[in-house]
Each structure stands twice: as structure tokens, then as C-alpha cells.
């Protein structure tokens, strides 16, 4: 496939953002909704029928103030005006949901908004922590097909996610910490640049609670990377890839770690692995890396 044809295909592929899931009425905030949001984001990250589009890339535009994000995650804010949001961000699909946990089981009510068709599709799913969150995935994939976005690359979205309830809750707390850092940014700080560092306590606790969790290792890698700890971030991403060799987030993290130390060969290796995982053009990945090494004009 030529680059021009690939660009044309990219234009045709829609974008989908997974919003943080909210606890059902009566269930206190525990971080699990954000952990589940991260899980579904990683499932859809390898969907080759969609353009790559992460909530974290848009979090500051969706929730420009930290209190807006924290209120939404705790169920104190309604879902934003979906038509206006979709038009402004040029994102067609938005997945939202509520959850409740009963022992080992997590019950989800999901809604997929299609801003182009001005429609909303719903599904109820149950996931089990004891089976690597595998039960319910095929039902979710089948539902996406009925919504007009059949999953391309299902085999890459079937890793066993070995995370405990505590690990999932700590994961969500860590993710909220990361998102709040994205929203606040260094420009909004009134003190030294050192305060831009993320407190990694929740990230570490998630890994300690669920050492064999791809999601926990991957998120810890991003926290370390954001703090400038490239060597430790790379180690965390490598641990994540041992658990899920096609984890799109960890592949991206390894690429950015390589770029950070001017390792062109390493950056190209992981950029092309990531592109291959998503069914994207390998030469486009090469061009992306080449541009990072071009001398400024």
C-alpha cells in the first residue's frame, strides 16, 4: 500500500474515545472506573479499523479544569454535550459507562455514542477478575460490529490481564494523577519546575498489588517517563511487553524512550512494531522517526 493510499485510509477511519467510567449509584469512588477505562482504551488501541485516539490526548480540552475531571470521575458531573464535543474534537465515537463490583465480578453498562448518526447503542457486560478480564471481551467485540465498527485485529486484544481488584483500583488512582498533571501542566504552576513531577505512589502500589498486570506495568512506565526517568520507564515498559507483546501503549512508550536518548535504531524498531500491531504503514512509521532526527531549520 502506498503512503498516499494509506493516508486516504486514515481519513476514512473514525476515531473513538473511551471516557472514564463512573460508579453506579451507591458505589463509592474507588478508582476502578478509571482502571476499566484504561483497560478498554488499551483494547481499542489495537483496533485497526479506528484511528489511534487516546483520552489522555484530549483530557485538557474535555476537562479544562482539574475539578471538572475529578467531579466527573466521581459521578458528580453529567456526560458533556456529546454533539458539541464530537464536533469540536472531530471524534465520531464516544464510549461511556457505569460499573459496580460484586466480589470477583464487575458489571458494566456501556453506551457508545455515534455523533455522525446521532445515535446511542447500549450493552450490559460482566467481567471477571479471576479469568484475566477475558470473559465479556468477545461479547464486546460482537457489539462493536453491530455498532458499525467491527473489530480489526481481535487476536491482539486477547491478552490475559492479571490484575486484582486492589490493583485495578490503584491503577485508576494513578491514572487520575497522570490526567490531572496533564490538565494542570507546568504553565499553571506557581512554584518551581520540580513540582511538575508526578507522585508515583499509586502507580507503585498498583504494580505491587498486581505484578503480572500489563496495565499496571505500562502505566507505571508512563508515569516514570513523564518524570524524566527514562531508564526506569524503559524497564517498566519492557516488563509490560513481557506480559503482552502487542501492548500498544508499551510499544509507544519504548519508542519515546528511545527517541529521548537519541537511539534512532531503537525508535524505528518500536515505531514499526507499533505500526504493524495496528495494521499501519511501516514506511510511515519510518518517516515519523526520521523527522524526529532532522536538524531544525
Could you describe each region identified by the protein language model?
Residues 1-11, 116-212, 216, 223:
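C-terminal/domain-edge helix-coil "capping" segments
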Residues 1-46, 171-190, 222, 231, ...:
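A structural "domain/chain start" motif
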Residues 9-83, 94-103, 115:
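Short beta-strand->alpha-helix linker/helix-N-cap micro-motif
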Residues 75-145:
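Amphipathic beta-strand/beta-sheet edge segments enriched in Tyr/Trp
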Residues 209, 243, 276-277:
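Structural marker of alpha-solenoid helical repeat scaffolds
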Residues 213, 247, 281-282:
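Residue-level recognition of tetratricopeptide repeat
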Residues 216, 250, 284-285:
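TPR alpha-solenoid repeat register
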